[in-house]
Curated annotation (Swiss-Prot):
It comes from Streptococcus pneumoniae (strain Hungary19A-6). The gene is tsaD. One of its GO terms (biological process) is tRNA threonylcarbamoyladenosine modification. Its cofactor is Fe(2+). Fe cation binds at residues 114, 118, 301. This is tRNA N6-adenosine threonylcarbamoyltransferase.
Amino acid sequence: MKDRYILAFETSCDETSVAVLKNDDELLSNVIASQIESHKRFGGVVPEVASRHHVEVITACIEEALAEAGITEEDVTAVAVTYGPGLVGALLVGLSAAKTFAWAHGLPLIPVNHMAGHLMAAQSVEPLEFPLLALLVSGGHTELVYVSEAGDYKIVGETRDDAVGEAYDKVGRVMGLTYPAGREIDELAHQGQDIYDFPRAMIKEDNLEFSFSGLKSAFINLHHNAEQKGESLSTEDLCASFQAAVMDILMAKTKKALEEYPVKTLVVAGGVAANKGLRERLAAEITDVKVIIPPLRLCGDNAGMIAYASVSEWNKENFAGWDLNAKPSLAFDTME
């Protein structure tokens, strides 16, 4: 049987990425052009800046992805692209590039949900057994998702306010840490002690919902009050206490979800899945089901994960028309 090559595009936020997947599971290339340095001075992603950067580098990313994969444009079988959720301007750049390539070569266009990409990146570790449960944690999302089969997603719990990654960046900004702050907070947390009593919102409530705004506010208030009084707080202890509260919330809700949905596999994915503290808690506390976490290179935004997620859509012949548009607020239950 002839090999299948999927060319995948990811431009939902501040990473321009193009990848090539051979058949179902052989990732031949995964080119990522990061914009972090451009956004650091603003303390967060500026949508217009992100869009301009995508336009500047996406052609080079396509060329590099094909060259690294050792194939030509004529070898590509299908084109996959993130169409949401994300920043509308950023999404449109990837969509325009993907549709142009697909149209020029007469190829099918596969629409992919960005968060499905994060989840299906676990396929790079080993073949996934369904049904499974997924904890998706990133800068824009905190969700528990039940996956009955590849491509069939149901959100069973999500944050009511801030995403966990968003909370990390906001408290990092208060402490004067470099954006994005997640990795630095994680490192500092391992050097400090959990001595500050931060709230664990909704941790005992009988649902699978998350809330991090109260924790964020409590952190900011403690830091602000100390500054007003001229008191010095240990950055390491602040980070350790904040991270302990976050992990307590994530673990409590995940354990409850596993009780309600008896599966054999838990996938933990998204940018925050790179967090060392989270990985340690998962290893220590989730022992009765298999826990699969994508490798670090596939935790952040990348086109490789979009390629993996596109396989189930290819198998279902879920192809999009040329009118496919960006859906910045796309949810799992509104996929094309």
